[in-house]
Amino acid sequence: MSILEHISSPADVKTLSYEQLDTLASEIREFLVEKVSATGGHLGPNLGVVELTLAIHRVFSSPSDPIIFDTSHQSYVHKILTGRAGAFDTLRQKDGLSGYTSRAESNHDWTESSHASASLSYADGLAKAFQLKGEKARNVVAVVGDGALTGGMCWEALNNIATGTERNVVVVVNDNGRSYSPTIGGFADNLAALRMKPSYDRVMEQGKTTLKSLGWVGERTFEALHAFKEGVKSSVIPTEMFPELGMKYIGPVNGHNTKAVEAALRYGRDHKGPLIVHVVTEKGKGYAPAENDVAELMHSTGVINPKTGEPVGTKSPGWTSVFSKELVKAGETRKDIVAITAAMAGPTGLSAFGEKFPDRLFDVGIAEQHAMTSAAGLALGGLHPVVAIYSTFLNRAFDQLLMDVGLLNLPVTIVLDRAGVTGSDGASHNGVWDFAVAGIVPGIRIAAPRDDENLKELFAEALTIDSPTVVRFPKGELPSRLSAQQRFDDGAELLHYSDSDHEDSTPSILVVAVGSLVSSVMEIVSDIEECGCNVTVVDPRWAVPVAPSIVGLAADHELVITVEDGIIHGGVGAMINEALNASEIDVPVRNLAFPEVFPEHQSRNQLLDAVGLSPRGIKTQIIAAAESLYLLDKE
C-alpha cells in the first residue's frame, strides 16, 4: 500500500520521515499525471509545488492557519493532503472537484477567485482580523507565484503587510520564473538575480578560504576583493528589495528540498511578523513531457496521453487561432498595429504576431490595468494597439478603459477571448460581464461575431475605427458558417425571414441573436415556425451600440426576443429595451441572457443548458413568451 493511500489530512504528513516524504512526493506526481491527463487541468504548476505544499502543511496548522494560494490553480496537492484525493476523477466536472480552491469543498480552502495577484490582500485582511480578535497565535500563509507578483495589487498589499509588525503573515514566493510563459519585467529580473546569489556566494567563500591560506598577502588580497565584491553585489543583486519594504527575507530556498523549505517556513512561523520566504521551484517537475514543453511547461492541458503528453483526439481550429492569423495579416500591411498581452501571449493568440514582429508585441505581465493605459499611450503616440485578454480579466481594467481610453476616445481595439460562458474553468473565469461592463463606456463599439468569417470581417472593421472597439468571442470550436440574407446600412444582418406564404394574421417574432448563440437560435427557428409563428432572426454584429435597423424591425413585430451569453443586467437585451423605450416603440420584449449568479463549474454546454441558453432552452423560453402574450395557444 502506498504512502499516499494513507493520507487523508494534513496531520498524516506531519509524522513522516524525510525519506518517506520523498517517496510521497513521487507518488503525488504520478497521481497528478494520471488524474489530470484524464480530465484536463493545471498540470505543470502543481507538479512544481509538491514538496513546497508538503512543507507548508507540516509546519502550519490548516485550517486554523489559513493557506491562501494566489489564483489557486496550483492547489491540487493541497487538495490531496486535505482529504480530496478520492474525488480527482471528477476534477473540473459537473458536481465534481473544482480546479481551484473552493470554500464549498473544504474548510481548508479560504478563497475561491482564480484571478491573479489577490492572495496578499486576502492575507493582509485575515491577519488584521486575527489581530483585532486577539488571536495572536494564528498565522496566515500566502503562496504567490506563476507571475502573480508582476501584478500591481501584490505590491499594494505588501506595502500594507509590511506595516503590521505584530501580524503573522508568511509570504511564500513560489519562484518558477513562469506565468503561462516565462515571466517578464523588472521584478522577474530581480528574482533571477536573487536566484543567482547562492552559487555566487559559494564561489566567493571558496576564494576566501584559498586566499586566507596564503598568509597576510592572501588576507589583504581577500579584503580588497571582498570590498569589490560587495560593491558589485549591491549593484546587480537586489538583496534589499524586500527588507526595504520592512519585511524580513529568507532565501532563495530549493523548493524541491522538503527539509530546506520546512526549515525556512519554521523560521518564518516563529519569527512573528511579516516575512518573505523565496522558494525556487521548477514548473512541470518530474514529468518529461511538461519539462520539455518549453513554451508553457504544460501550464494548462486538456485531456492528454499520460505517457506522451500529447492531446487525445483531433482538435479543430478554434476562435483564437482565427484571430491570431488575422492579426498577423493586419500587421503585415500596417506597421502601426501593435499588440499587448498581460502574460498570456499564447492563450490569447498573440504568439504568432510576436514571432513575426517581436518589437511590436508588449508583454506587461499580469497587469491588465497597466496594459489598458499603456495601450492608451501607444494610441496617443499614433499607433493602433490591440489588447488581447480573457473576457473575465477585463473587469480588472474597467477604470482604465473608461477614463484612460474611453474619455480620450482613443483607437484601441480590445479582443476578448473566452467571452460568455466558459464552464469548466469555474465561476470566476466565465466571461459573462463584458457587455455590461464595457457597454457603459460612451462611444465604445462592441462586436460579437457568430462564426469565423464574421470574426475576420469584424476585426478588420475594428482596426479602421478611430475610437475604442471591442471584439469578443467564446472559448472552444468554431460553429458552422451562417450566411446572411441581407446586410443593413448600420451593419446588422438579416439571417432569417419567414416565408411569405404565411397569412398576414400570423403572429410575428423578432429574435435578436448575439454572437456565439446565433447558431443555437437558427437551429430552432423551424420549430418555432411549426408552432404557428413567423420568425425574423437578426444578428447585430456590432451589438453595441444598438443598431437603428433593429429598432425599426422591432416596431414591425409583436414580440421581440433577445438572446445573448452575457449577464442579463446591463447586457445587450437591456440596451435594446432602452432603445425601444427611447423611440417610444411599445412592443413586448423578453431578454434571454445569463442570470445574475455565480455558477458551479461544469462544461459549457451543461451550463448553457442549466440557464436556458441551449437550443432546447431557447426554444422553450420563446414558446413560453409567445403563449403568455396569447400569440400562441397553450397546449
Swiss-Prot record:
It holds the Pfam family Transketolase_C. GO terms for cellular component: cytosol. Thiamine diphosphate binds at H73, S114, H115, A116, G147, A148, N176, Y287, E368. The keyword Transcription regulation does not apply. Binds 1 Mg(2+) ion per subunit. It is an enzyme of class 2 (transferase). Its EC number is 2.2.1.7. Mg(2+) binds at D146, N176. Keywords: Isoprene biosynthesis, Magnesium, Metal-binding, Thiamine biosynthesis, Thiamine pyrophosphate, Transferase. GO terms for molecular function: 1-deoxy-D-xylulose-5-phosphate synthase activity; magnesium ion binding; thiamine pyrophosphate binding. Its cofactor is Mg(2+); thiamine diphosphate. It catalyses: D-glyceraldehyde 3-phosphate + pyruvate + H(+) = 1-deoxy-D-xylulose 5-phosphate + CO2. Pathway: Metabolic intermediate biosynthesis; 1-deoxy-D-xylulose 5-phosphate biosynthesis; 1-deoxy-D-xylulose 5-phosphate from D-glyceraldehyde 3-phosphate and pyruvate: step 1/1. Catalyzes the acyloin condensation reaction between C atoms 2 and 3 of pyruvate and glyceraldehyde 3-phosphate to yield 1-deoxy-D-xylulose-5-phosphate (DXP). NCBIfam families: dxs, PRK05444.2-2. Homodimer. This is 1-deoxy-D-xylulose-5-phosphate synthase. It comes from Corynebacterium diphtheriae (strain ATCC 700971 / NCTC 13129 / Biotype gravis).
